[in-house]
Amino acid sequence: SYFSIKFSNLQFSTKLIDGKYPDYEKVFPSGDPSTLSIKKEKLQLALSRASVLSNEKYRGVRFALSKDSLKLTANNPEQELAEEVLEVDYKGSPLEIGFNIGYLLDVLGSVESTDVELVFYGEDSSCIIKEPSLESEVYVIMPMRL
């Protein structure tokens, strides 16, 4: 019940698990989506600036989305506040949702495209991040309460 691969100076081993593989598709939200389209670098830079003042333990950032506008807010226990408003292409109902800023930056660092889409299904549902030109890769980020 083990699987092993050996290369010249590398060995990879894993234990095979008996059981049913979890239904990963349940992680993907469904419903009426709201979509944010933005240049990856524009969002990365804004999140990097906000991360300076985010809470070191929870690293939260709040997204306040409305027609063609994204307001990013991060704060810390010292009552310092970072706030930035970005002009974006947003289609959907107004929405406020929080995320771990580190997770967002990690995903954006993995995306190769210059543009990204963030698809929201409500404040309590996960967010899908994808490259518009590459439908086969999607990233799922769970929201956090702020």
Predicted features by range, described:
Residues V27-S30:
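Short hinge/gating elements
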